[in-house]
């Protein structure tokens, strides 16, 4: 298996409300295919959810990386993400981060476009104080939370990182002279709840 389940306490990062538990990640069947299922559940006054990564098992440098994902409705504070982190053994953001798809941001919740508004970004820099980012967020015109699978694609070469959904280009980042994005990265999937991104605490 290429995936490791993560465990973290609530509030571990980004002021998120959930704790991550291995029990919230399952392998199942849907539409005849084997799928990873990440679930967020309220247990009393606590929320637990799922997060997996391919660190130590599968790395990528350049190429085409895509995932077919069925998303929940995010207007209530759910924050699903398909992303990557660098494996240079540096702390964030010096490791580099590629956010292929994030949904559920505060702006989308506020203006009623949460089901169509996709965020994609690059994060990098020598340390937290020197954090830089390239960022795109926009209404793609598709309901990506309609109960169907949608395909999110990263195309990555020496010059560009391009992100698309269902073969529709969302954004292209120029990385020609950005040393943070020319090394091995691993993949993560998670379902966060609340926090700074959603504006729900």
Task: Identify the role of each PLM range.
Residues 1-201:
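GH16 jelly-roll
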């Amino acid at each position: 298996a290429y995936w490791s389940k993560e465990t973290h306490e609530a509030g571990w990062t980004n002021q998120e409300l959930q704790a991550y538990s291995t029990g919230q990640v399952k392998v199942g069947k849907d539409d005849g295919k084997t799928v990873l299922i990440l679930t967020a559940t309220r247990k009393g006054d606590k929320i637990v959810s799922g997060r997996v990564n391919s660190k130590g098992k599968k790395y990528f440098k350049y190429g085409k990386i895509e995932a077919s994902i069925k998303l929940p409705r995010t207007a209530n504070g759910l924050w699903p993400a398909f992303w990557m982190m660098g494996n240079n053994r540096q702390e964030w953001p010096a490791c580099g981060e590629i956010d292929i798809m994030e949904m559920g941001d505060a702006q989308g919740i506020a203006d009623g476009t949460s089901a169509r508004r996709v965020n994609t970004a690059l994060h990098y820099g020598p340390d937290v104080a020197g954090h830089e980012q390239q960022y795109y967020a926009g209404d793609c015109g598709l309901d990506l939370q309609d109960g169907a699978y949608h395909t999110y694609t990263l195309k990555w070469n020496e010059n560009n990182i391009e992100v698309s959904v269902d073969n529709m280009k969302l954004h292209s980042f120029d990385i020609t002279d950005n040393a943070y994005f020319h090394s091995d990265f691993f993949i993560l999937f998670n379902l966060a709840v609340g926090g700074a991104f959603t504006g729900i605490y």
